[in-house]
From Swiss-Prot:
Its main location: membrane. It holds the Pfam family Complex1_49kDa. InterPro entries: NADH_Q_OxRdtase_suD (IPR001135), NADH_UbQ_OxRdtase_49kDa_CS (IPR014029), NDH1_su_D/H (IPR022885), NiFe-Hase_large (IPR029014). Keywords: Cell inner membrane, Cell membrane, Membrane, NAD, Quinone, Translocase, Transport, Ubiquinone. It is an enzyme of class 7 (translocase). It comes from Koribacter versatilis (strain Ellin345). This is NADH-quinone oxidoreductase subunit D 2. GO terms for molecular function: NAD binding; NADH:ubiquinone reductase (non-electrogenic) activity; quinone binding. It comes from the Bacteria. One of its GO terms (cellular component) is plasma membrane.
Amino acid sequence: MAHMNPTPVLEAGQDKTMVLNMGPQHPSTHGVLRLLLEIDGETIVRIMPDIGYLHTGIEKTCEAKFYQQVVPMTDRIDYLCPMTNNLAYVLAVEKLLGLEIPERAQWIRVLCNELTRINSHLVWLGTGAMDLGAMTVFLYCFREREELLKLFEAVAGQRMMTSYFRVGGVSLEPPLGWFDRVKKFADTFPSKMDEYEGLLTQNPIFVMRTKGVAKITKEDALALGASGPTLRGSGIDFDLRRDMPYSGYDKFKFNVPVKTEGDVYARYQCRIAELRESCKIVQQALAGMPEGSIKADAPKVVLPDREKMKTQMESLIYHFKIVTEGFTVPPGEVYSAIESPRGEMGYYIVSDGTAKPYRVHMRSPSFANLQMLPSMCTGQLLADVVAAIGSIDIVLGDCDR
């Protein structure tokens, strides 16, 4: 019986070329990515990505879950920015429900999302630099990342799979002193950025390995569905936080870094500048954090406070019904997209009026950005494939789902 999804085969051309397998177990593919490479000496003639090694069927699984039970599953898609995935999903459900989210909850979401963006970019910077031989940067980046993971653990109870956002707001009020800890991090982070840039930006070896390497034109980037720093590194000035604001982003002032060269170095510059801009947004959120509730006034959707459950029978009944039966969502369909660290993260949800989604589809930036690889790498040297993969910052859980 024929296999439903046969393994891709790349045949060698004339006797000058040969075919190599890179991955799926390879440290520089940043996950279980397999690349079939046809090479002529050290030059890439053709490249074919082979994905699916991390496929979990998560979209289908969502159809068997209550709407609120899907939130922890979104953490596992792009595991380097779980709160970003949480936000994209809950915004879609809230749009179907027509919920109005309190301003404080929106600002906490923005604050946590920018901390998540910094966290994700630190992993990209540290691992991408190490792929090119810059070991010191990796150690510095993970020094700051550890502080961020401690902040996530303090506010959400988990270092990585946070599940902090809820349909209707956030799960808990940040603990006492948490905002002060975030402020301390944001105040010191620019000096840490200076350290990273001092090691890389003008480093002649790093510049030689990245400038003019793995170029992608803006026409190809648009045609293949690129987004995020991969798109902006090719000269397209587009950021969903600014151009289609959500969760109160229209109240924040920040710049969108854009470069026109389209090479690895341009994408590096975009993300480095983005780290600084995210830090500025964090500082603005801390300075202007509004008072008020962290949950929408929707007792049939949002779990009541535990204190109310102890004294109000109605709250206890609502809690029991939400946990055991879920909440129903009006029939309809919606697409909601946000700007994740890797680009446009979108959720398309179809509701049939029950407590479980009829269909959930995730538009993941890593899957779209991976399509750039053949255009980037054809004609490049074999060693430059590592730099190209690092520059598009893919996460295979985000690709395969």
